[in-house]
Amino acid sequence: MILGEEESWVSERTRAEVLKELTAAEQPYELVPGSVFGRECLRFKSAPPTLRELFSESRSDVEFIIYEDQRLTFDQAYIEASKIAMILVNDYGIEPGDRVAISMRNYPEWILAFMATTSIGGIAVAMNALWQPEEMAYGLDDSGAKVLLADEERLARFAQIAER
């Protein structure tokens, strides 16, 4: 279909008008004053207070992650992420506020690592998977990450700088 001068896919409403409507009282994305880490801000009234609760509330048998022939439901992903979270806490001493670097391709494990880290109050440091050893070293040093979760290719790169 070719649009004439009188037809348009663009609404006359501005982005600001739409946002104001969606975030107004009694609307799906109502914003209310709140505090996050001691800082006053606006937050979604109906949102779970933490990502951990969001992940927990999302548990179901619906497929969540599909990669090649691998399929994980929301529930399976939650269980796998919980296992990783326990390792981060019990074996590596990760506590809320600690940074955990994630360096890998777009594998299902990336999502699980993010879920695990944020569910225990950690800060996920997403590292560029294309970074070379020197860039990885800078990212790790600059972020203050206590742990690196990486795939085999990134671990091989990390091995070149690990002795520092």
Labelled PLM ranges:
Residues 2-20, 119-164:
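Structural core segment of the AMP-binding/adenylate-forming
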Residues 28-29, 52-54, 159-160:
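Intrinsically disordered, low-complexity boundary segments flanking structured domains
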Residues 37, 60, 122-125:
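Residue-level signal for pocket-adjacent positions within structured domains
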Residues 1-47:
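Flexible, non-catalytic linker and terminal segments flanking ANL/adenylate-forming cores
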Residues 42-47, 52, 61-115, 132-138:
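Conserved AMP-binding/adenylate-forming core of the ANL superfamily
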Residues 57-58, 91, 142, 164:
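Alpha-helix C-cap/termination motif
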